[in-house]
């Protein structure tokens, strides 16, 4: 190890930055975040630095560097484009035993400014010791995706209860075990999901001996339309820490592959006229599993609150006092239309968008047809594959032109995506010949014409033909 990672407390302490350009402005910004009292030495200032000066956040010495300017400084950064000046700053700072960093010159530095993942008060620093800063930044980017932005709130929450926990537990080992349980349990998740008041109440109950630290919870997570890259960071984190996963038919196999490997998997998918479990039984299953103390992932395709019956499920959870959180997902209308190259709104074609379902019941589809055939809008129909012929007939019967563009997308956003385009008059026959299978999404409106120009996603031909 060539360098020792340390964190310096700089609040209200004098720091000197030599240089007034863009790079210097970035270094000044870092020092400002740490609360330092910053003086910039430069004949001229970058607009960002000039703004900071006008707002009274920094001091400015409008001159070239002089050694006397180092007097009193506890840290120095040289960020000029003059190599000789940078060497002089390094030499004079080291003669005074002042830590010095020279940008892009590790041989002149006594400290390195790392790449930083800021989740204040939690900080992660990544450094290559000046040998490969680009690699360090790439690694920092990967770490950024692994640490939720709300981890800073979790660290601040822990600080709030630190003394109370010290009073409650006498040994370091007891405190460590307690905090691990807090961070990995319901209280930690409440903080991360923004339910801090509930977390404080639960923490106070536990510390007073009136509450339990270990109890179950439910994560109602939207798995998106199929492509796992469209998952949110929070969805992925909860998927990888659940004890049991209750999942639907519409969750793609690629998304399911990201669920914690040793989690129990319970399939409750529904298809037309065939339900593995009635909805009320699913609701009660979630309650039972949570009461067993398990972290339950309720994973749904798309978004749980858009035709996903998520509202019914959390009603039951609330009635039974089960902690839960809801993680939105990209609904099929958004994700699938984007991957199909069909914008849902467009200045020239559609100023509004309507979502509905196309369930076929007793040979008919019961929809507000007058609303569906209004001009200058896009209609998106979920679960309408079987009812497609009836949908097209009814739209024409209620005034829509037979040549109105319409498209249907099978397994959108995945490598098995297939798109069939036509009109209200022609699409049912085209779909029958194509042999499409659910899940499918129907898009009706003039925006479908744009697909010819805007289609960008090209699944593997081998996969599509095999599907």
Swiss-Prot record:
Source species, domain of life: Bacteria
Region Precorrin-2 dehydrogenase /sirohydrochlorin ferrochelatase, residue ranges: 1-203
Gene Ontology MF: a single term: NAD binding
Xref: PROSITE patterns: SUMT_2 (PS00840)
Chain ranges passing through the membrane: none
Pathway: Cofactor biosynthesis; adenosylcobalamin biosynthesis; precorrin-2 from uroporphyrinogen III: step 1/1; Cofactor biosynthesis; adenosylcobalamin biosynthesis; sirohydrochlorin from precorrin-2: step 1/1; Porphyrin-containing compound metabolism; siroheme biosynthesis; precorrin-2 from uroporphyrinogen III: step 1/1; Porphyrin-containing compound metabolism; siroheme biosynthesis; siroheme from sirohydrochlorin: step 1/1
Keywords linked to the UniProt accession: Cobalamin biosynthesis, Lyase, Methyltransferase, Multifunctional enzyme, NAD, Oxidoreductase, Phosphoprotein, Porphyrin biosynthesis, S-adenosyl-L-methionine, Transferase
Phosphoserine, modified sites: 128
EC nos: 2.1.1.107, 1.3.1.76, 4.99.1.4
Ligand binding (S-adenosyl-L-methionine): 225, 301-303, 306, 331-332, 383, 412
List of catalytic residues: 248, 270
Region listing for Uroporphyrinogen-III C-methyltransferase, in residue ranges: 216-467
InterPro entries: 4pyrrol_Mease, 4pyrrol_Methylase_sf, 4pyrrole_Mease_sub1, 4pyrrole_Mease_sub2, CobA/CysG_C, NAD(P)-bd_dom_sf, Siro_Cobalamin_biosynth, Sirohaem_synt_dimer_dom_sf
Keyword rRNA-binding: no
Positions with a binding annotation for NAD(+): 22-23, 43-44
Coiled coil segments of this chain: none
GO BP of this protein: cobalamin biosynthetic process; methylation; siroheme biosynthetic process
Catalytic activity: uroporphyrinogen III + 2 S-adenosyl-L-methionine = precorrin-2 + 2 S-adenosyl-L-homocysteine + H(+); precorrin-2 + NAD(+) = sirohydrochlorin + NADH + 2 H(+); siroheme + 2 H(+) = sirohydrochlorin + Fe(2+)
Function: Then it catalyzes the NAD-dependent ring dehydrogenation of precorrin-2 to yield sirohydrochlorin. Finally, it catalyzes the ferrochelation of sirohydrochlorin to yield siroheme.
Family (UniProt): In the N-terminal section; belongs to the precorrin-2 dehydrogenase / sirohydrochlorin ferrochelatase family. In the C-terminal section; belongs to the precorrin methyltransferase family.
Record PANTHER family: SIROHEME SYNTHASE (PTHR45790:SF1), SIROHEME SYNTHASE-RELATED (PTHR45790)
Name recorded for this polypeptide: Siroheme synthase
Annotated organism of origin: Methylobacillus flagellatus (strain ATCC 51484 / DSM 6875 / VKM B-1610 / KT)
